[in-house]
């Protein structure tokens, strides 16, 4: 690949990465193309060398944000010899995650935008949430597939909802109460004494 093509590919990647972070921080409609390009010290007109439209950037940026969040979730759940649901929940419902939207969970940050976007965007969310459910179901361990999925769905919904609510009320006693209470209830679901259930041994 020639130098100009490498440079263009690098700029394209920078645009997608920056958009993914800013969308999580401000919402999909919370930053203009002009501001995004200015933040990256690029010309507004140069945008169309990389994308046919803003919607095309949105699609790519959401794909990146959702994939990265999903991979971070899986990495945290399976970082040791045994699944660590407690560790994942601790990190997810930490105040630093509440306050760090740009580097945090894309589903919690952007799910509110999805109903107003295209069917393609909604399909992206659906695909990633299914992947997240699969990862959490696997981490939960023994039990029927239906039971594990139901528990995983309840936990994920509680996580997304708690983070959204905690952010909505700002850094306040209520915000901290939401994080603390939901964490405790989730750990009661995920195994005895708040510890992750052991996975079934391979036969």
Predicted regions: what is each one?
Residues 14, 18-58:
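Helix-turn-helix
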Residues 12, 16, 62, 66, ...:
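Amphipathic, non-transmembrane alpha-helical scaffold segments
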């Amino acid at each position: 690949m020639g130098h100009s093509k490498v440079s263009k590919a690098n700029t394209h990647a920078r645009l997608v990465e920056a958009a993914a972070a800013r969308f999580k921080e401000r919402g999909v409609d919370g930053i203009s193309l002009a501001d995004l390009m200015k933040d990256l010290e690029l010309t507004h007109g140069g945008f169309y060398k990389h994308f046919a439209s803003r919607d095309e950037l949105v699609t790519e940026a959401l794909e990146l944000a959702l994939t990265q969040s999903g991979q971070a979730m899986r990495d945290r759940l399976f970082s040791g010899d045994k699944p660590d649901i407690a560790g994942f929940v601790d990190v997810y419902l930490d105040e630093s995650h509440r306050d760090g939207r740009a580097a945090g969970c894309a589903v919690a940050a952007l799910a509110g935008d999805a109903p107003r976007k295209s069917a393609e965007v909604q399909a992206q969310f659906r695909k990633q949430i299914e992947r997240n459910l699969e990862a959490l179901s696997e981490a939960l361990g023994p039990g029927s597939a239906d039971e594990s999925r139901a528990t995983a769905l309840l936990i994920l919904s509680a996580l997304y909802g708690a983070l959204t609510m905690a952010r909505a009320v700002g850094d306040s006693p209520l915000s901290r109460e939401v994080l603390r209470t939901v964490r405790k209830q989730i750990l009661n679901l995920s195994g005895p004494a708040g510890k992750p259930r052991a996975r079934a041994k391979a036969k």
